[in-house]
Amino acid sequence: MAVSDGWTLALDTAGALTVVGALAPHDGPATERVGEPEARPGRRGGTVHRPRHAEQLLALADDALTATGGAWDRLARVVVGLGPGGFTGIRVAVATGRALALARGATVVGAPTPLAVGPAVGVPRLVVQDARRKELFLTVVAGDDPTAPDPVPWAVPVDGLAAALDGLTVRPTVAVGDAAADHAVTLRAAGIAVPDDPAVHRVDGVALARMGAVRPAADAGAVRPVYVRDADAIRTADR
C-alpha cells in the first residue's frame, strides 16, 4: 500500500517510556499513546522503574491506530526509533517494526530517537539522555530539515559534561531529554536553557510519525539500532 493511502505508525522504546504515534494519510488525524514503566522498590532503597515495552507496545499501537480511524490492514509505513538508549529497549521497537512491516506488506523506516525528543522547543537543541554507567548520551539537533544528514550522538562521562559543552561547535539554546533536568545546573551555567515542562523531555510519538512519513524507506534488515557504544555486561549497582 502506498504511504499516501495508508497509515504511518511510529514506535520508540529507547527509554523508560513506551511511545507510539499514529498518523492518518492525507494530513488526517494523528495521535500518540505513552506507556509508563513499572515502579518497584529498589534493592538498595528508593524506586526502580522497569520498562514494560514488550507488554505495552502492540496494545498501544492498536489503540493509536483505532483512535485515528485506522486498522492494521491499512498500515503503510512503520517508523522505529533507533536510539540511543537502553540496548534491550531499542531492540523491542526495531524487532517489532521489522516484523509488522513484513507481516503487513508495509515499508519500514528508522530515525534516531533524539530527533523526536522536544521538537516543540525548536533548534538548535541539545538532547541529553541517561546512558547509565555514570554517562550521558548527547545529541545536537541543529536543524529540522528532514533531508539533512542525521545528527550523530556520542557518550560522555557525567563529570565531563561541562567540558563537552565547552567543545560544542554548534551552540544549542535549549536542552531536553530524560537527563536534562538532572543536569540543569551545568547546562544553564553554559547558557543553555532547560524547560520545566516534563512533556518536552520525552519522545513525541506524533513527531516521530510525521518525520518517518517523509524519510526514505529501507529494507527491514537495514534498520539497525544506534547503540553509540558496545553492549556488554555490567552489574546493576555500577550503572
Predicted regions and their residues:
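N-terminal beta-alpha supersecondary unit
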Residues: 2-80, 84
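Surface "functional belts" at beta-alpha junctions
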Residues: 3-6, 24-52, 106-202, 220, ...
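Generic hydrophobic alpha-helical segments
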Residues: 57, 61-64, 68, 114, ...
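Glycine-rich phosphate-binding loop signature in dinucleotide/nucleotide-binding domains
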Residues: 68-73, 168-171, 215
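DPxDG-like acidic metal-binding loop motif
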Residues: 77-108
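Short, flexible loop segments at boundaries between secondary-structure elements
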Residues: 197-214
